[in-house]
Structure formats: structure tokens, C-alpha cells
Amino acid sequence: MQRNDPLYLNPSDRTVCRRRFLQSASAGLVSALGLGGCVPSSLDSDASPLPSSSVDLIIGQRGLADGRFQKPRALAISPSDELYVIDKTARVQAFDANGKFLRGWKTPQWANGKPTGMTFDTKTNSLVVVDTHYFQFLFYTPDGQLLESRKIGGVNGTEPGQFGWVTDFARAADGTIYLSEYGEYDRIYKYSADGEFIDRMGQHGDAPLEFSRPQSLAVDEQGLLWVADSCNHRIQVIDWRESQPRIVSILGQQGPQVGQLQFPYAMTLLSKDRLLVSEYGNHRVQCWDRQGNPLSVWGTAGKEPGQLNQPWALAIDALERVYVVDSGNNRVQRFTL
């Protein structure tokens, strides 16, 4: 493998991000835990680290060239299994299922800050970039053409159609759109399938239906809304199918143990009633059933294949292979379940 190949791993190029606020929060909290796949397995904290053979693919290293990253923040996967990754340079890069770089582009503005979320909206066949510090949701064609007419937001404020720092976009099977923001208000918004404001809920706090940086959203087969309430270190499950939202369950609590969470920045729903959660603070991924019972866990703090450094986002492809944004290591790792 050549040094200019995006899959080449040069240990000297792998840097460790050391944010001060998370140094103190997560110091000493990471256990060495093994991969058992998303099926029931031993969860001993003395389990051996994830073997490198369990890592199916590694994409990227630190840099500005095509196929390299500077602190990747979000990713999305299209129905054709093209992978899109955005980093702190505001670059969107597209890769095929083998990790080959295909194309890239930048968001229109980035001086105020970079996007922290991204999803592929199958209803409109478009890539949604959550342009956090410009208070908007940008829609692109798969080849990178900006669809101005579909943009949601763009103005900072508290009126309908205005946002704080936006974090994620999710669409229910009936077309309903859910949007999240953090900052002054920490709220979730409900929009029609056509992008018209319906309602909003939440405020900053730690009570049910309150949030502290709701970073990741998902909607299950029943239409229930799942929220990674990251700075409250929990997952909230909400029924908002009618006019008034209702809490269904709250999963997790802060801590380093299996079944606990430390800054869960991303989650995704799997088949067989399973849930994947990546933890920025514990440098790992957990698989739970949808009642919050742990099934498996993998990842240790580090820079070797299978280790993680502040994972920011995750997604699954059509084969339910798991892609993890290993932000502090400037790469994306793919794991097979």
C-alpha cells in the first residue's frame, strides 16, 4: 500500500485530540473491552481488546489531500452504499464501499464554524449537511450540487424557522421531519414532509423532555423519536406522533461501566430491535437492545486499528457494517457485526 493511498496508516500522522473539558470528564473512565458483535456476549471489563482483524476497513489519516481528514465530525451513507464524510475544514468527501475517494466539495461558508451532522435523506435522494454554526440544513444532490430551494433555516433566532446551533436531521416513514439544536435553548423541532414548521419542544435541563446538546436523532419503525441527549449522558425515547410529545423511556446514565454513557454523540437503530451508541467520552461503541440492556461493547482509547479516540458519529450500510468517525485519529473505521 502506497503512502498516497487514503487507506495507508502512518502512525506518525495519527494525532490525539485533547480537549480540556473532556480530559477531566473522561480521565480514567475507559475500560479495555472486547468486541462480541451485536449479539449477547461476555462483557467483562477484563476482556481482551478488539483484534485488528475485526476491523474491516480504515479510511483516511490526517491531512488536507483527497481521502484525508482534519478531525472528521459526521458521516452518512447513501442507499448505494456511498460514504460521505465531513471534517473540520468543511469538506464533504465521498467514497465508494471499498474506501476509494470519489469526489469532494466544501460548504458555502465556514468562517463561523463547521458542520457537526449529516444524513442521507432517501425521500428526496439528497445529502443533508447540518450546518451547525450557520443555523441551517443544506441539501445536496449525491454529486455535490447544492439545492438552494430545499434549505431549512439560515437565521439565528427563536421564531419558527429560526434556529440555534443545529445538530441533526431525521425523517419518519410518514415523511415527518425532526430537527435538533443546542446552545441557548436545546430543543427538537417537528416539520412536515414538505419542510413546513409544525411545532417544537424542549428546553435546557435534565428532566424528561429536556435536553443538553441533543446531538443525534433517529426514528424507529413505530414512529418513535430517539434522541441522543449527549451532555445528559442518556438516550430519550419520545412518542411525538400526536400533538403532545410523551416520554416513552430514558436509557443510560453517566459513567464508564457497560450500560452507562459518557457523551453519547451518535446512535443508530439496527434490525432485531437493537441500538448502537458511540461515546465521545468513553472512546467506545455499545450495542444495546431497545430496552437499554447491553449486548456488546467494543473500543479502547488509542490509535491502533480497532481503538478509538473521541468517536463523533456512526452509521450502518445495507449489510449492517458499522462505520465510526474516529475523530481524534482523523479516520473512519468500519467494523463487521
Where are these regions (language model features)?
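N-terminal secretory signal peptides
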Residues: 1-17, 27-34
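Eukaryotic scaffold repeat domains enriched in small/polar residues
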Residues: 39-337
